[in-house]
């Protein structure tokens, strides 16, 4: 029996930060729904953008691409961005693809020009 892959997210906003909680499996079939919510908040430079991955079980290259896009936009704006509760399997993928090199150990975005200047190094 094949399990149905399910991805869910919910967003909390308080005027100072937008926190998006991700759970389940983020793959090509689920990416457009996350892309829509990210598009609605990623350019709000006065508010911290936080992705909470605590309940994320799986992420494919499409999902990683969405996160990389958010990193690039936030870095170009010098806006606050953070990824909280990165599961070990996802952390390993971030390490392999180079995404981790743009985050501090606590998941916050490094102040680093290489993010926007050397896009080919991410993924």
Map each language-model feature to its residues.
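STAS-like cytosolic regulatory interaction modules
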Residues: 1-57, 69-123
């Amino acid at each position: 029996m094949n399990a149905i892959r399910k991805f869910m997210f919910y967003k909390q906003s308080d005027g100072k930060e937008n926190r998006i909680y991700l759970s389940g499996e983020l793959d090509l079939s689920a990416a457009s729904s996350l892309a829509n919510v990210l598009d609605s908040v990623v350019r709000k430079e006065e508010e911290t953008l936080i992705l909470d991955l605590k309940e994320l079980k799986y992420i494919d290259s499409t999902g990683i691409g969405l996160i990389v896009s958010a990193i690039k936009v936030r870095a170009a704006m010098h806006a606050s961005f953070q990824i909280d509760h990165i599961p070990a399997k996802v952390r390993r993928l971030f390490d392999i693809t180079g995404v981790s090199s743009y985050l501090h150990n606590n998941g916050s975005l490094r102040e680093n020009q290489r993010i926007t200047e050397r896009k080919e190094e991410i993924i």
